[in-house]
Design a protein with these regions (language model features):
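Pocket-lining segment of extracytoplasmic ligand-binding domains
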Residues: 100, 179-271
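Periplasmic-binding protein-like
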Residues: 118-128, 208-235, 246, 285-289, ...
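Short, glycine-/small- and polar/acidic-enriched structural segments
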Residues: 35-177, 182-185, 189-193, 222
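Secondary-structure end/capping motifs
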Residues: 236-314
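C-terminal motif of bacterial Sec signal peptides marking the signal peptidase cleavage site
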Residues: 22-26
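Bacterial N-terminal signal peptides that target proteins for export
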Residues: 2-14
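Bacterial lipoprotein signal-peptidase II cleavage site
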Residues: 27-35
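Conserved C-terminal helix/tail region of periplasmic/extracytoplasmic solute-binding proteins
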Residues: 305-335
Length: 335
């Protein structure tokens, strides 16, 4: 009688199982490599060293939101270059900048476009040590102002003082001030800070401040800072890629709003040199500010663009008037 293969022989099942595992593994490896090869590479250049303004970008990359949209995104720092120039010349597809920079660039025929407001309202203002007794812009007279040497910065300071009937010429401007905590009360009596970073850090250190928010001085100063930018040329030629980028980025910032502690951990994982306590506090503050009273994260109000464009022109911060409707766009945000 001929030998028959027992169809219930366990060794047959082992061989079949191993064959299936190897086939599936091979398919998965091929699929992963194919997926990686198909990802479109783009970059986003930050405006400054990494901080909590940028957390949504790191979250979108870390949690695979960019990859879900078919994008491989490099997060770059500007180094000695200016982000606006990097984006305008096509060396980076996207960047982080400020509303006043976009307006100034467009007045010089550099067609940058803001495609999202990272924070819905201006969270910056003038800060001083409480013991300095600076409670209103009237108290700026006779004091030293620590400046980072921005033309719009000094124009806003001057306009603020004039509105309150104070004399800007009675302020001593100290140039080259960039580190609030090492200079306030020593080299300068008051400085311009972003509350979501330096303000919450002062709270953590137990440093009592007097703080005058810009948006409470005049509605025109409630402009967008920072913003996500691209160039007109790139947006026109790559509308779908731009929409994919913004879809992932919006999801990243929505995560920051919903889970600020987890988002802080992601930023710290990618930028371990940051102070964990400062990042955690900053994220708790910004989670309420990223979207604030807007319906969706990133949306830009035409009124904000119109009034600040007009103000910059009136103050002669730009030589040519800028069409505000061309300086920003909401069309790349997911509906």
């Amino acid at each position: 009688m001929k030998n028959r293969v027992n169809p219930f022989n366990p060794f047959c099942y082992i061989i079949i199982a191993l064959t299936l595992v190897l086939c599936l593994s091979s398919c998965k490896t091929k699929s992963f490599k194919q997926e990686q090869a198909e990802l479109q590479k783009v970059s986003v250049t930050l405006d400054w060293t990494p901080n909590t303004n940028h957390t949504g970008i790191y979250v979108a990359k870390e949690l695979g939101y960019f990859q879900e949209q078919g994008l491989e995104v490099d997060i770059l720092q500007p180094g000695q270059n200016v982000t606006d120039q990097i984006v305008a010349t096509g060396k980076s597809e996207f960047g982080v900048s400020y509303q006043e920079n976009v307006i100034r660039a467009r007045s010089e025929n550099i067609p940058l476009v803001s495609i999202a407001a990272v924070i819905q309202h201006n969270t910056s203002g003038f800060a001083s040590l409480k013991k300095a007794g600076i409670k209103s812009p009237l108290d700026f007279e006779g004091k030293r102002y620590g400046s980072w040497d921005s033309p719009s910065e000094l124009a806003i300071l001057r306009a603020t003082m004039e509105k309150y009937g104070a004399d800007f010429n009675k302020v001593t401007v100290i140039s080259g001030i960039y580190d609030f905590f090492s200079t306030i009360g020593k080299d300068a009596d008051f400085e311009w800070i972003y509350y979501g970073w330096d303000g919450v850090e002062a709270e953590r250190r137990g440093i009592a401040l007097n703080y005058i928010p810009l948006k409470e001085i005049d509605p025109v100063f409630d402009y967008y800072t920072p913003v996500i930018i691209s160039s007109e040329d790139y947006l026109a030629k790559n509308p779908q890629t731009s929409k994919k980028f913004m879809t992932a980025l919006k999801k990243g910032y929505e995560y920051c709003i919903a889970k600020p502690d987890s988002a802080a951990d992601i930023l710290l994982k990618n930028v371990p040199e940051l102070n964990p306590e400062q990042v955690k506090r900053s994220m708790q503050y910004l989670a309420k500010e990223y979207k604030s009273d807007a319906l969706v994260w990133g949306i830009q109000n035409p009124v904000v663009w119109k009034r600040f464009c007009e103000w910059m022109y009136q103050q002669r911060l730009i030589q040519l008037a800028v069409d505000p409707d061309k300086a920003y766009s909401n069309e790349f945000l997911p509906q």
